[in-house]
Regions:
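Structured, active/binding-site neighborhoods that engage oxygen-rich ligands
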Residues: 1-157
Length: 158
């Protein structure tokens, strides 16, 4: 989770202004967290304390309504709905918020199941689910000491 949040903050200044170099300052005065950090913390809160995932995500969305870069248009609408439904997104938002799932469980199967659950509340398109599962699986496999080669072979998406 720390890596996901640090990466989000480091990349925040380049989100809409891509660079083509590996030499850049990691943190600047303009660096800040984005919607991806907010939803990563929301998912982690849900993993730790339970409750209804949609309600937890809505609470964080209300508490942090204007992150740097904003929420995606459809996700922003989803946050405003009183009865939010999945909207078949195949975007990367589900993958961006799932990192804690890779640390939370003792089996790859459970990790994949919960990654799907965290994705499906909004990103219920098969690609949105696969993205979340891939990120959570790679984190789980690395955490459990698998080699790079084994991670490539065992990752459900490669």
């Amino acid at each position: 989770m720390i890596g996901a949040i640090a990466g989000d903050i480091i990349g925040s200044v380049y989100e809409f202004d891509n660079i083509k170099t590996t030499v850049f300052p990691l943190f600047t005065r303009k660096s800040n967290y984005t919607d991806d950090t907010i939803m990563t913390v929301a998912v982690t809160d849900w993993l730790l304390y339970g409750g209804n995932l949609v309600q937890v995500m809505h609470r964080y969305g209300r508490e942090f309504p204007c992150p740097m870069g904003g929420y995606g248009a459809r996700f922003g609408q989803w946050l405003c709905e009183t009865n939010p439904q999945p909207y078949n997104s195949w975007g990367n938002g589900s993958a961006m918020r799932v990192s804690a799932v890779g640390w939370a469980f003792g089996s790859l199967e459970k990790t994949l199941q919960v990654a799907e659950e965290t994705a499906a509340v909004s990103h219920n398109h098969p690609e949105g689910i696969k993205g979340a599962q891939a990120v959570a699986a790679v984190i789980y496999l690395a955490r459990t000491g698998k080699s790079k080669q084994a991670i490539r072979e065992l990752s459900p998406i490669h």
